[in-house]
Every structure is written in structure tokens, then in C-alpha cells.
């Protein structure tokens, strides 16, 4: 009994001020699985999107290999990618992936707005076309008016909405042109600094 008391009263081999963080094996394993899952998300990306990520050369090569593999080889390659990711900081990769996901959701929201604008143009005519021209001055006003009249006739005659689709495509092209102009102006500002 005295021996046990003596052990309990002994001073620990580290200083009291030092804080030792004990990490369980389960926690380590969960961290590794999270890295492997991040690697799996990177493997699912298209090569064009993957090129925008700040990847070390060996990791980029491993991801390209994993995209070719099937079944068991793919699973082993994903584990290897997880192992490679232990040696790099995953934060920039996660941030770039989040930015990419956000961009897709923004694009979807813009397409929904374009659909609503198209429906307004078909229903209201010139007043909605004026709103569209304020948002997208690159759009062809005369073509929009012509397509709006045709879409109204198609809707009244229960015909397929060919003109409505053309209005949507016209608005989409105008939106893309506006985005390109904005991106070029941002690039010009960045290069000027």
C-alpha cells in the first residue's frame, strides 16, 4: 500500500507548465479518414477544375492515377492519397474546394433568375425587356422583342416553347458576356496593383 502511495505522489516527468495534448488512436484515424475523403473529393473533380488547385506534383499524379483506376485499386490509391495529404496543409485545398462548390451554387441561382426573367418577358413584354436590358445591356433588344412576341403566340397556340428557349439562351449569352467583362476588369485592376 505504501508503494502505491509513493507512486501517486511522485512528480510527473514533464513540467507542470507544459501542456501535453494526448490524441487517441480513434481521433488520429478520424483525421486520416477526413484527409482521405478530401482526396476522394479531389479525385471526383474534372481535370480542368483540378488544375486550379495548389497541389504538389506527387499528389497531382496520384489523383490522376486514381481517376483511371476502378474498384479495389481505386480504394488503395485513395488510401495512398490520404497518406500523401498527411504531409501537406489541407486548408488551402479545402478552401479551394469550398470556393468551387460555392461557384456552382451561384451559377445555379443565376440560371434560376434568368428563367424567371424569361418568364416575365414572355408574360409582360416590353416592360420586362426594359428590365432585362438594364441588367444585361449586351443583349439584343430587337431580337428579344421578336422572340417575346413569338413566345406569346406559341403559348397561346399550345405549341412547343421554342422561342422561350431562345430567349433563355440569349439572356444566358448576355450574362456570360457581362461576367467576362467583369472578370477582365478585375484582372486589369489586379495587374495595375
From Swiss-Prot:
PANTHER family noted in UniProt: UPF0307 PROTEIN YJGA
Q: Where is the protein found, in the record's own terms?
A: Cytoplasm
Q: In the UniProt record, what gene is named as encoding this protein?
A: darP
Q: Which Gene3D superfamilies match?
A: PSPTO4464-like domains (1.10.60.30)
Would you say which domain of life the source belongs to? Answer: Bacteria
Asked if rRNA-binding is a keyword of the record, the answer is yes
As for what it does, the entry says: Member of a network of 50S ribosomal subunit biogenesis factors which assembles along the 30S-50S interface, preventing incorrect 23S rRNA structures from forming. Promotes peptidyl transferase center (PTC) maturation.
The organism is: Vibrio cholerae serotype O1 (strain ATCC 39315 / El Tor Inaba N16961)
Protein name as catalogued: Dual-action ribosomal maturation protein DarP
